[in-house]
């Protein structure tokens, strides 16, 4: 059912969060942040590194790169 499908952004963020995949986040001002995503909602992402948490607003994010290859494709069309 189309209503049950998750959007790509949420699927990606949930995958790296559940797998505790290290990510690099580039902000629109060029700042690079690294850590593990522990939580997210429609407006922000919580990034954890070395026991410290950073709340990053999504409107400030340019790119999120996982530290390892990931596959979101589950074989369904």
Curated annotation (Swiss-Prot):
This protein's UniProt keywords: RNA-binding, Stress response
Highest taxon, organism lineage: Bacteria
Record domain Sm: where: 10-70
Molecular-function GO terms, alphabetical: RNA binding
PROSITE patterns recorded: SM
GO cellular component, one term: cytosol
UniProt-listed GO biological process terms: regulation of DNA-templated transcription; regulation of RNA stability; regulation of translation, ncRNA-mediated
UniProt cross-references to PANTHER family, sorted A to Z: RNA-BINDING PROTEIN HFQ
NCBIfam families linked to this entry: Hfq, PRK00395.1
The family this protein is said to belong to: Belongs to the Hfq family.
Function summary: RNA chaperone that binds small regulatory RNA (sRNAs) and mRNAs to facilitate mRNA translational regulation in response to envelope stress, environmental stress and changes in metabolite concentrations. Also binds with high specificity to tRNAs.
Protein name: RNA-binding protein Hfq
Species this chain originates from: Paracoccus denitrificans (strain Pd 1222)
């Amino acid at each position: 059912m189309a209503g049950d499908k998750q959007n790509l952004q949420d699927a990606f963020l949930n995958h790296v969060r559940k797998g505790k995949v290290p990510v690099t986040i580039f902000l629109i001002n060029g700042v690079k942040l690294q850590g593990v995503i522990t939580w997210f909602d429609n407006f922000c992402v919580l990034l954890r590194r070395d026991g410290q948490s950073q709340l990053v607003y999504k409107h400030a994010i340019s790119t999120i790169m996982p530290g390892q290859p990931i596959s979101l494709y589950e074989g369904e069309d």
